[in-house]
Each structure stands twice: as structure tokens, then as C-alpha cells.
Amino acid sequence: MKKFGLALAAVAAFTGSAVAADMGPRGYSKAPAPMAAVASWTGLWISGGFGFGMMEYNTSVTSVAGTTVFDPGHDTGGKGWLGKVGAGYDYQFIGNFVIGAFADAQFSNIRGQNSFTCPGICLGPTQGYTGQIKNDWSWSVGGRIGYVALPGLLTYFNGGYTQANLKQVDYVFASNGTAVGLSMPSRRMGGYFLGGGTEYAISQIPGLFWKNEVRFSDFGNRTDTQGCGAFGICGVAAAAHSLDRNHLYEQAATTELVYRFNWGGAPVSTKY
């Protein structure tokens, strides 16, 4: 019996050694691939840039009662440079489509000379007057919809509400530049805008984009009271000498740098 037990122990030892030899060294499993970031247009952004704008100012002037026409109507053109800042939020959905909301402000030097000839019934003898129409700032709020045409390239259309500020106009005689005494106070005009553009990723700097946009703005109609001062040919101060009915349009082209705070999106595994 003792010999039988020793024989079993020897067989077990031999069998274990053989099995261990057959198994060989333990295999090595490669670590899973790192999570890769997928570009996403969803998130907050800020922007800043500059551009060039042109305006058209349509105006006509009558007496306060509207019974006398001082100026039947004419157009004034203007142009100038502008600076622009903005911020917004975009959301990418259904693959390559993007929607967003934004607000921006423009600080500009878009101006033109509003010159016209007023008949004798206006202010003394028939003669020419001129005054500078200047849009010195404006702001806009709106939305946009776009399509990611290529990796890192967004094309879009936008629209919304906009408001512009026109500085006070002080008219002078066109012949010698001396004050007429006729003026129109600073005022604001509001309307809508429509535009479109592109955003392109600057690959060397993650999150930085180059945006180019064109925009048309219609600031609507407005009627303003022109006052007269106690100088020039007015002679007597009058808060309401005449009515100026006007309409302002503007077209602008801008180029900006945009920074997106979460460009790259959330990490997504490349192995399933």
C-alpha cells in the first residue's frame, strides 16, 4: 500500500510538470488603443476682427405739418472701416448640420455727405446745404444655420435683428462751410440683417478659426425732427423746424478670428 501511494505521487508530479511544459510562457495582450477626439462644432465661441462697409441713406424733408416740401428726396452714399467683436453658441446635429445663436457689435467710421439744395422757402435764398451722416456703432443678435462641407470648414447663413446709431448732423453751407443753424440730433435705427460666410479651422492652433462674412442690413424707416439754432440764417431757436424722413441700408464684409472653447469634442473609442 505504501508503495502504491508513492507511485501515485510520482505519477502526479510527472503529469503536472508535463502539462506546465506544454502550456509554454504566458501570452501578452496589447493595451486598447487610446481614445481619439472627434471634431465637433458644438460649444461656445468668441470672435474679433475688422471689415469694410458701405451705406445708403435715403431722405426727404418737409415742413413739420407736412404741407411744404423742402427736399423731395435724394440718396446719400457712404463708406468706411469697422471693427467687430462677437460671441455665440453652436450645436452640431444630424451629422454635418450646425445651428447656433450669437450677438455681435460693430464700431465703425462709415460716413457720407448728405448734400441737397433747399428752395428759398426753406431757409432764406435757394442754396446748397451739406452735413455728415455717420454710423459710429451698431449691434446685432440672431441665429445661423450651417453645413460642414469639409473637415474643419463650415459654410453658413445667418439673420436677425440689428440696430445702428447715427451721430448728430450739423448742416453747413456747401459754398463756404459756415454753419446754417439747422441740425438733426443723434438717433438710432433698427431693422433686420441677412448674411452668410465661412469658417475654416487653422490646424496649427487647435480651436482657432478664420471667419469671413458678408452681411446686408436694413435699418428701416424713421422720421426725425430737425431743429434750428439761434445763429446762422435761422436766427431764432426752433426745436422743430422741419421733418426728415429717412431710410438706412448697409452692406459690410468682415474677416475675423474665432476661438472655440471645446474644439475636438469628447474622446470617443476607435475600437469596438
Identify the meaning behind each predicted range.
Residues 2-272:
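Gram-negative outer-membrane beta-barrel domains
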